[in-house]
């Protein structure tokens, strides 16, 4: 074979607008084509193997040497089988060729998407069967495929698919495989018999006749082109390029892609003929987007005796992928890895290495993908599209508009009525516009020819966008061009297409012409003067404008386009999104599982009245205004939603899952571990995993499918019951990934698949090798004495609170820097939010800590408790007033009384007055108080009479007795003096008590104020210690001097020294560096905050177990056995002092695990919380005793310290001196465990706490404050007010004689009235029994009455 290379030969004449591609075919009919698809359906797989560089397009414009890189570009999928195509010889009778024999490739239109690559001649030079004659074998020859590519495709006149509209790119091999022809023309179907626009059409095809076209040295270079022209006339061709190919049978690759620069052709023949790397060899000036392609059928018209087999070719779609490429020293790609093929590929790409050692590698973390959907939208009537489905559609300049609100639309149903030729959108995808919700939907429709499609494009400056119709791109818009099918008879065709090609205004001088351009979403100004249809090209219309309209003339001219066979229309769709709920939604049927309530806790896609996204819904407490539906945070993130079901749901982001790859280099096997996640979660979130992983999850293979383990969900591992002692692929939780090697000791015959990886358990059978015990005895050291000690421990429970003004820290007030900082988005907000979250975490941690460890409030102590408690302050003060403390109820009724204050002498006075006449003993009963005689200030009537008589007598007798009778007035005067003394004494006591109350109350207030002040000062010390952030910020502040590559750390210096552009670059370096430093600082704070929170939990446990109780855990509350613990507050934490005792002396004893009766081996006992021991001092053989485990205190073995157990080989058999529990035969008694006498016979001294005074507490010294608090408590206790007793004395005043006389007379009169009323008002009914009335009253006349019979009911 001769090495070949492309020779680029351009057969294009650039001076012409269209190129000459030769004359049309002169044949009146096309060769009949026979389609027998079953003959061509073969299974000859040729999957992509990127490890051999299959289908690799070399990076454009650069080269590499001896390097491995990851590269993002267009590549085929690893393992892609592609689409297989094969050409065949045609029908022949002897030496006469007949019908063409092809597959149905012309109607099999594919999406072009990102392009494709083609494997050509893979089976060349081998032996295969002839397609048309499967029983015939022949040498397989290489043949090149032909392609048809375009932007618009539809049906031929008979309804068969495969017609390309507008300009179409054709890649046509010719010259018996020695050249490739590329041309870009409008393909006009020919109307002859068997032609696309004629009768009996089945398919178009190309062909060549080897006998005449491929004779040695005389190849027909136009054989295939001429055959193609039999089916299509080539019109308006913009170019035709021809590329020569040297004939060979070597496997080669061909590729085609499209960018804004045009269509690019690639081939491995250009540079790397034998390696397979494709290099670009041509760029075709095709700028319309290629959307579709099809394979042009080709048939070889060989004679029947000379039929050959032709190699199949394979087309593989290109995808935007990431590949790991390995470049050789000479610069070619010799192997590659598709990074998205499987998890092992991801591992290689993550480490950019083709050689990875065995191990368990973390590759990435995948965010959970939605496992369902949630949809809520307005329910309304269906949008009415009927106006556009009836009548004659208007011309483009007179388009009709439908505006929809508050309705449900079905755009898919509407478009299904038409044959859509073109669907382009701006700011939205075609799929999204048919599935989203909007506040309004605007639909414009008009008749429009597809041949003028480009005039409606965004960048067009033609008459359509200038004077007829123009869409506004401020909102999402779509433009649809479609053909009305024949069966849609409700729409009638206009006679022709017409449009305005000119619209201008001439000013009043008739010389100045101003074009009147159409505004977006508005009608043309000339629509009022142009009729609904323009009849002839160049029709001219004019209208004189009124002065109000500015004067002058409005002129327009029109153009027409011939009506097509089928009406073609244009649809312009514009949608608007509302600020809240959107009422125009697609007409969809929702299942029950699309409700929020059915998807709680799951990662779902949601669409809520036009607001869509992804997240997890949970029930929450309602916030915000219900009528507004949506609740947002300060960063405009949706955080809550009021559902139609009446509930409020909060929304959070979906979680992420860490992924690891388990790889064994020896066997080249791997498995995937999804850490700490349930398998049901990963199976519903597959879309982001590798393609192989997704395939396994969909297949749900019971052997290699998801396997739940304690470390997460694994794929590619087979569960087994194997145990291994040495594991090179440990997974954690004593699990091991075991590759298929001879070390598994698993016979190959029982393995399901060679090369599998198994899940095994790690068995630590012999971690420590020890000698076998020779007897059931063992020696033991038990403490016999203890010494006390103190363990000091500090636990940090919080960190310094830190807040940073991000903008001030980064920019220091420079406006230029702050402007650039805005380009970093919400970085500063996130920083502050993270720091605030850390501070709140600290507050919650400290609050929870102290809420858990604080002492609960004590209940009041009531009288009656025994002991040495002084409860007198809490008891009510009792006042004794003598034996007669009160009068009887009758006395209270019969006498007037008054209660007065008693300074202390009233009771003595009252007792004295009871011994004789009150009027005579008043002065005798005067009491002494503080040296003064006092009497009560009240006097009864008798005293008043006696003193008044004495006073009057003394006054009246003065003249008769020469003044001697005045002595009779002395009692009266003394009574007045003594009573005034009593009033004064009472007032003095009241005044003294008032002073005591005021002083003691002020003393109590002062004590409480001092206590609060002291407590406040202590809290200030704690707060100062906790919030001391100088050390935390020192590192952050030091970074302000770092230049981070800028010319200076001072922004002001940079602004002063540099121009504007250089300032931006230098300041941006400082911003980037300082933000990085700030981000690292925040990350450190978050870690420290979480660590402190965990320590706070430990401190809470220690307070609850060590301070509030006595711990039984060894080493948890200090060293040794715990006795008591103390805790004090310390900066950023708590300071513990644990008091415990440590063993100081031990004794070595012989012990046994258990004891059994040698005569009855099933009768065995074991110690409870202790040991069976036999000391060296034991003189009697087999004499055993019991001791506790913490202190040596031998005691007899009884049922209280033992329990019956099953016999064990380590138990000691004894035959003599059996302890009591072994003397009985019953072993089924259920003994209740009791506490051992732990401190029995403990000999030790009183704990010495002297060392506690040496603890350095200067960091947080609260001694003075605690003493002050004690003084405050003492002062409060002393504030009890010991008031001088002021008793209550009740004075009774007896009534005078005339009151008693009137009282008695009243009682007698009342008795007489009652007697007369009862005795004299009837006979036989009085209180006197059966006495007659004449015995107590006058006689009444008697009347004789006849008796009457009376019935009493």
UniProtKB/Swiss-Prot annotation:
Signal peptide: 1-17
Subcellular localization: Virion membrane; Host endoplasmic reticulum-Golgi intermediate compartment membrane; Host cell membrane
Keyword annotations from UniProtKB, A to Z: Coiled coil, Disulfide bond, Fusion of virus membrane with host endosomal membrane, Fusion of virus membrane with host membrane, Glycoprotein, Host cell membrane, Host membrane, Host-virus interaction, Lipoprotein, Membrane, Palmitate, Signal, Transmembrane, Transmembrane helix, Viral attachment to host cell, Viral envelope protein, Viral penetration into host cytoplasm, Virion, Virulence, Virus entry into host cell
Annotated positions for site Cleavage: 751-752, 887-888
Disulfide bonds: 185-237, 339-349, 383-407, 425-478, 437-585, 912-925
UniProt region (Fusion peptide 1), positions on chain: 888-909
UniProt PTM comment: Specific enzymatic cleavages in vivo yield mature proteins. The precursor is processed into S1 and S2 by host cell furin or another cellular protease to yield the mature S1 and S2 proteins. Additionally, a second cleavage leads to the release of a fusion peptide after viral attachment to host cell receptor. The cytoplasmic Cys-rich domain is palmitoylated. Spike glycoprotein is digested within host endosomes.
Keyword Lipoprotein annotated: yes
Any coiled-coil regions, as ranges: 1023-1067, 1258-1286
Extracellular side: 18-1296
Cellular component aspect of the GO annotation: host cell endoplasmic reticulum-Golgi intermediate compartment membrane; host cell plasma membrane; membrane; viral envelope; virion membrane
Fusion peptide 2 as annotated region, ranges: 907-929
Annotated BetaCoV S1-CTD domain residues: 381-587
Domain BetaCoV S1-NTD: 18-351
Gene Ontology terms describing biological process: endocytosis involved in viral entry into host cell; fusion of virus membrane with host endosome membrane; fusion of virus membrane with host plasma membrane; membrane fusion; positive regulation of viral entry into host cell; receptor-mediated virion attachment to host cell
One family name in Pfam for this protein: bCoV_S1_RBD
Membrane topology classification: Single-pass type I membrane protein
Assembly and interaction partners: Homotrimer; each monomer consists of a S1 and a S2 subunit. The resulting peplomers protrude from the virus surface as spikes. S1 interacts with murine DPP4.
UniProt xrefs under HAMAP family: BETA_CORONA_SPIKE
Protein name per the record: Spike glycoprotein
Encoding gene per record: S
